[in-house]
Amino acid sequence: DTVLLNRISHDNAQLLAIVFNENVIGKAYTGGMCDPRYSVGVVMDHSPINRLVADTMAHEMGHNLGIHHDTGSCSCGGHSCIMSRVISHQPLQYFSNCSYIEYWDFITKLNPQCILNEPLRTDIVSPPVCGNELLEMGEECDCGSPRNCRDLCCDAATCKLHSWVECESGECCDQCRFIKAGNVCRPPRKECDVAEACTGQSAQCPTDDFKRNGQPCLNNYAYCYQGNCPIMYHQCYALFGSDATMAQDSCFQVNKKGNEYFYCRLENGINIPCAQEDVKCGRLFCHNMKYEQDCNYSDRGMVDNGTKCAEGKVCNSNRQAYQR
């Protein structure tokens, strides 16, 4: 790792050898991918048929990706599988169902960053070859051979985009052209959200936007804030479950104490008591409808910013009521 990594940036190294001391044709660290010490395999150049040596290399790289040898219950569609314990003289084409499961376990549990990012084109040292489905220097696209290409935007013969192409992908791109202006690309997800529409000049949907803060929502029961419609009932539900609702107004009066539990905000380590008009912007109080318990509160439960605290007023980030 001290020599090869300094020569060229790489995620994994597969080393070809002529002679092995043991009766094997390949070795690799299982689950070593992306580890600078263990992301490596050693493969014996055991056959004049390149495809068979490549199969062995794929097998060892499979080990690096956290995949073990197949067992009797594994299958890849009736063919000899790449991670089989037994060497086949027939070309191996597929990983088994067991291999796929182990691979995804490796990806999701260990989150190996080196194979989750797209390599720079400049990191590819082999000469660019149009038609190998690998986007390399000098290419705008590479969809494989002209016979196999399924990319409408790409000229498979030149690995360049067709002259008429406006876009390749995106919410506002369809068959390599911008979708007409006005077509909705992101519908509103909730009441305080707004729909976004394509501009006709870009493949990307415009930035997600929402209704202006202070606009009424929930039949004037609350006001929009940062795309949400915050109300104390929903906050009580999140803290105490379906039997909880907002407590009566008298419960909030203790927020004027300014002690460890009941206050509006913290300034220089001091709990500042709520002014009378701000009491519903401090500690949140809930009522348990099942057990008729009033004034329930949680150490995590301060009234959310933007919550309606009086007619025409909401709580701001300073835990103060202000005119919407």
Swiss-Prot record:
Note: Negative results: does not interact with alpha-1/beta-1 or alpha-2/beta-1 integrin.
Enzyme Commission number(s) of this protein: 3.4.24.-
Residues carrying sugar: N97, N296, N305
GO molecular function, one term: metal ion binding
Organism of provenance: Bothrops leucurus
Its job: Snake venom zinc metalloproteinase that acts as a potent hemorrhagic toxin. Hydrolyzes the insulin B chain at the 14-Ala-|-Leu-15 bond but not the 16-Tyr-|-Leu-17 bond. Degrades the alpha-chain of fibrin and hydrolyzes the Aalpha-chain of fibrinogen (FGA) while leaving the beta and gamma chains unaffected. Degrades type-I collagen and its gelatin. Degrades the alpha-1 chain of type-IV collagen and its gelatin but not the alpha-2 chain. Degrades plasma fibronectin, plasma vitronectin and basement membrane enactin. It inhibits collagen-induced platelet aggregation.
Record's protein name: Zinc metalloproteinase leucurolysin-B
Any Gene Ontology biological process: proteolysis
SUPFAM superfamilies attached to this UniProt entry: Blood coagulation inhibitor (disintegrin) (SSF57552), Metalloproteases ('zincins'), catalytic domain (SSF55486)
Disulfide-bond pairs as recorded: C34-C114, C74-C98, C76-C81, C130-C159, C141-C154, C143-C149, C153-C176, C167-C173, C172-C198, C185-C205, C192-C224, C217-C229, C236-C286, C251-C295, C264-C274, C281-C315
